[in-house]
Every structure is written in structure tokens, then in C-alpha cells.
Amino acid sequence: MKHADLISQMTLEEKVAFCSGSDYWHTASIERLGIPSILWSDGPHGIRNSVGTHDKDEPKKKDKKGEGMDALLGGIPAVCYPTAATTACSWDPELIYGMGELLGEECISEKVSVLLGPGTNMKRSPLCGRNFEYFSEDPYLAGKMSAAFINGVQSKGIGTSLKHYAVNSQETRRMTVSAVVDERTLREIYLTAYEIAVKESQPWTIMCMYNRLNGVYGAENKWLLTDVLRHDFGFEGMIVTDWGAENDRVLGLLAGQNLEMPTSNGDGNRKIYDAVKRGEISEDFLDEMVDGVVDVIMRAKEVLADGKGYNAGEHHAAARKIARESMVLLKNDDNILPLSKKAKVAVIGQMAKKPRHQGAGSSLVNSIKIDSAYNTMFEAGIDVIYADGYAMTKKEKKNSPETYIADAVEAAKKADVAVLFIGLTDEFESEGFDRTHLRIPPEHVALLSAIRGVTENIVVVLAGGAVVEMPWIGETKALLNSYLGGEASGSAVTDILFGDVNPSGKLAETYPFSLEDTPCYNNFPGHTATVEYREGLYIGYRYYDTAKKNVLFPFGFGLSYTTFEYSDLKVSADSIKDTDTLKVSFKIKNTGDRDGAEVAELYVAQENSTIFRPEKELKGFKKVFLKAGEEKEVEIELSKRAFAFYDVDLGDWHVETDNYKILVGASSRDIRLEGSVKVESTVDAPVKDLRETMPAYYSADVMNVPDDQFKALLGHEIPESEIHDYPNLTFANTLEDSACGKNGAKLCKMLRKFVGSEGMACSIALQTPVKNFVSMSMGVFSEELGRQLLDILNDKKPMGRGILVLIGKAIPAVVKGLPNLLKNI
């Protein structure tokens, strides 16, 4: 232990106090031992410190957000950087490292010790409401970007919390659903990004997920937290729950989870204390868990004492640079872009003035300054004609859509080119709920169609944090995907549209033609009890490329205002052992007349695999800046893992002796160079041929995998997919689980009427376990009230007037507060 001297001076009560937060955002402290309380804060692309820089024991000053639970929704003004979905498209770890440094400086200024991020979950389905917070569908790219982010933040002496470890790929029933996943898929897809981040950056903390993995909650999954994370990956830091993710405090601690957040008002501490007294937990083991918490506190203590400020203007400028290097040019017919600064431009769409620059939920930042594309064009002297194009607010939506469209059409008629700002709104994607389709608002599509009726010179700037369908793409000459570009997204868009910056972003996820094309279409978001990952390894381009499925835009795709030529591929050897390192080199030349940057992508494909594998997998990449006419040589090294698959029987990564193609290109579908190397295995282990038992996985025909093949993949029976707990519901059940009962149906109907029938509030109210109503209500909803509620939900007690009055005092506060509270998760 690192802090045995301090821990030896603690009482048992003091030790267990360090196993949970002292409130929503702080850890415990012991003044006599010089152990301060530290502050945690969201989030991955900007500080969302709802507490501020006041001392923990001082009362918080009132602000416009008020006090109590609603106060948690607020946040200090901070720089809002592009979201992970955006920055991943930069394919530039150095850029993300720099962003991490800036966030670290801001944490120091606000006395934040641990920043909750990055989010490293895999984009299994484009429907996931939180995809804007995650990097990629590819674990190698996500892992490299995560490691860069972590190293950047922690270089300033501030901790990070890599989240949400590890199989948390949906918002529907995110607190209770069990992800049913085979071990090979876990190791190769859902755990690899975390493994890379841990081995290359050692985050101070890792946040475990809410949901269950193969029946076991993430917060108490010993295999996941100890066997894999600590033993296999070599994680040395502290494990913290997601806010409110604790299910059984004693099991969580024994599984290797150090800290429960937020405070459990002493309940979790009492359970640990009693377990120690019973001998269920040894005090030596408790000391080790406490040591992990104390270590994080003491590492941050010295830096926070400096209390240095930061230059908000410089950080805003950096956010602009990050945004413009991450945005992706998807279409540019007739080289309509870049636009002439002398052109008369119709700027259409309210997003041009009110950019959707970030997502909704726990990552929501109170941006210091927001650049709009309209203002930055106007300030640059561009001749601009503006039209709203569509309604944004409820009040505006009472007006006729035709009125907005008519004004926009008139503006387009007077201009040389029409630039339309359209995309996903907060109502269409957010933390707390998943999308049910991939469409953008219909009024945006109608607007584009109307403008196309009067001009063919149309440029679309698409905003949003996730993949969308584009049956309308033929209506526009150019398409710039700005994703969610942070507070400087507007100026970054202007920089690209008018050629001050050459776009260099490339997609970190595949854009299919339709939702029905996605590999997990029939298995997302799953059932009431489970979600089955029947597609196995085949997510994203691994599926589309192997199944030869046509896509709208492939993984790794992105255009530039210049052109690049690849040549002279060399491999350091024709044959290597799996213990050797292979060096791959090639040249890239800028053959256009503009300076620009190209992302070179390296994929590996096994030629004659016995085990089923994706057609090819990303194993290296490099972003290279080249002046017009310049040529550079790129070198990428490949080690054993670039050729290996995870052998479940062997319990290790294994390379099958075979020839492997080395593929270098501009996207997964645009391979420019090809080489080959023979790799010889140094481990004498047979590779199973599973074609007879799992043929669907050899052909990537995974849309409808039969039960027998999925069972064979899992290596065990397929778990029951539906919840049948009524009338024996427990604190782990949700209100939605009671809907089949008489009282539960009434209560669910009442709540839908109270919070609305869809969106974040409805999802949270109905899909939050009763235990979280207790733990997250700041004492408003007591455990006793929870028991009484369960009696009602189980139809053991009538919904009489007296109990309704009692519950009625708490339910509104909890339901109103939960969306705000859970936005802090």
C-alpha cells in the first residue's frame, strides 16, 4: 500500500467513510491526518462543475438555478470543446492530448481533482442516445484517442475517470439491462479500447457502468473489475461507480470497486462496517480499497493548492482549432467549396445563429462564449442574407412551417449560393433515451427540398452527435458534417466553408443507408431483462465490409480541398514470428495546389483464417500535414496484437500461422496500397474450425443469428430475456417492471402524464430502479417509503388515499429532480 502510515491511524469508521462520497461531488476527508476532500466534475469536453470553487463546508451561494436538487443542473461558465464523436474524426491523438492539457488547466482553476471522462464505449448501434460522447465503432481508434485525452489531462496533475467500463452501449434500461455477450467479442471489441487506454495512460480512476454484463452488475462484477481490469490490463488506480450505480455495497467492494458515488447517506458505509465486523470483509482488504481512494486524493492535493487560472480566450481559440480539424467534408460536387468571400450567401436555418454545439445530459457545459456561423461570416465581411428556415422553440412551432420555408426560398433566390444549417436537435438525441430512427427533423428535409427548387448551388452544414440517414443527399452539392463542434463550432464552420482551413476530418463511424442495414437492428435495444449481442464481432465496418454491404459513407472517409497520392509500400520482412515487430512504411504526396492533412489508415486482413474474423481491422493510422506538392514517408509498427484474435479456450491472444495482408488507404473502402507478410505462431495451439456450428459468423450473416448458433458462441444457455418479477419486485426493479400489475399500471400512467410520454424525463422516471429513487433523492425519498412503494407495485397494498398522499409528497420531487440529478451522471 502507498499510504499505509495514514490508514493505520484511521478508525474503522473513518476507513469505511472513504468508501463512499461525502456528498454528490466530494470524497471524505480527515483533517487531523491532512487528507482533504476532493471535488469531481463532469465532463469529457468541458468542466461542468455545479459546485463551483467554494470550499466544501461553506454554503453555496444562491444562483439563478436555485437550491436543492435543481441546483445540480447548473454549472460554472467553462469552455465547451467538441464532443468525442467530433474529435475522434480528427484522427489526431496529439490534438486530443492538447485538449486534455487545456481541460487539466481549467480543472486546476476550479479546484476539480478528477474529471469524469473520457467516454470510451463502443458505438454498437447508431441509435444510442449517448453516442455523441463516445469516440468510435472501432476499439483501436477509441483506445488511442482515450489514451491521448487521459495523458493530456493527467499531465497537469489532474485525474481522469475512464468510463463507462465496459459494455454500456445504450440508454434504454441502462441501469438494469443485462448485456449478453460472448467472451471473444468482449475481449476484441468492448474491452480493447479500455485496455489500450489503461496500458498507455493509467487513468487515475475508472468508472464502472450501471448495467449488468451476463447477469452481473458492472459495479460488483469481480471478473470485470479485478480479473480483467487489474490483473490482465494492469490497472493501478481506483474504481468508482457511476453516480447511483451501486447495487450491493459489500459485493461491490469485494469485487474490487473502491468508491461509491454519490453519498449513500451512510447506508453503504454501515453495510461495509457490519461486513467487517462479521468477518465477511477482512480489514486488510478494506485497507487496500481505502488506499486507492486516498492515493487519488493525495496525488491531486499538491496541484490544487496552486490554484492557477487560465486564459479563456486562448482556450476558446484552441477549441476552434480542434473543431475545424475534426469536421468532415462528405460531399463537394463541382468543387463548390471553398466558397468565394465575394459571393452573396443565403444563410438558412436557425442553427446558423444558435448552433447545436454540444449534447444534452451530464456533459452539458455552460459555455463561456458561443460562436455562430452567421456572426462569424458577417464579421468576416461576407455578403449574407439570413432566413430562419424552420422553427426551434415550442412557441415558434405554432407558426406555419410554410412561412419559414417561403422566407428561406426568397433568400435563396437572391444569393449565389445557399448554405443550409440543419441536423439533429436535442429532442432527437440525448443522454437518457435512445433514438428510434435515424432521420433528421422532417421540416429540415422539407426546407432543403424547397430550396433545391430555386437553386442547385446548395451547401448543407449538418449538426448532430450521431449517424443519420440521408435520402436527401442528392439535393445538395456539398455536405460538411460539423458534428457537435463545441462553443467555437460556428467560427470553425466559417473557416472551412471559405477556405481559410482545409478540412481534414475523417469519419470514425460508418454511415449506412438505413437503420435496417445495421448489424444489431433486430437486437437493439433488446428486451426487458437482456440485450443480446448476437452480431458478435461484427459491429460497424467490421460488419459492412465483411458482409459486402453498400454504405452511404464508409468508416474513415473524408474529403479535402486537395488530393493525395500513396506510394512505395514496404514491409520490414516477408516473414516474422508473432513475437517480432513488423515495420510498415509508405509515402504520401500532396498532389493538389493547397496545403492539407491526410489520415492514412492501416488495416490487417488474414488470408486463410480457420476461425471466423472480420474481413479487415484497423491496426494503425497516422495524420500527416503536407504542403502543396510535398511528400513524406510514414512508418507504422505492428506487433503481435495486430495479427491476433482472442482464443477463449487458450485464455489469451493467439496468432494463427498464415499470410496477412497489409492494407493502407484513405478509408476502409478506399485501399491504395497492399502488401503481405507471413506470421508464424510461437504457441502450439490448434485453432478451431467452427463452420459447422456457427456458419452465420463466417459469412457475417448476423442480422438473424439462430438460437443454436448464438448459444454456441456464448458457450452456455441463452438467458431469459424478459422480466417476470411481479409480484415480487425488489429495490432493483423499475416502475416499468410493475406495469403488468394493477397499481403499477396506474402509477406508470400517472407518471407519463406528469413528465410526458417520451424523452429523457419519461425514460428516467419509468426505467430508474426503486433503489435509485432512494439513493439519488438527497433524503427526499426514504428507504421506508421505497418499501411502501414496492408493496403498492406488487399489489400487496391498495393505492389508498393515505399512501397516495404520502408518496405524493415525494414522487414529484424525485421525478422532477431525477432528470437533473441523472444529467450529472
Describe these PLM feature segments.
Residues A739, N743, C748, V755-G759:
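N-terminal, non-catalytic alpha-helical interaction modules of very large eukaryotic scaffold proteins
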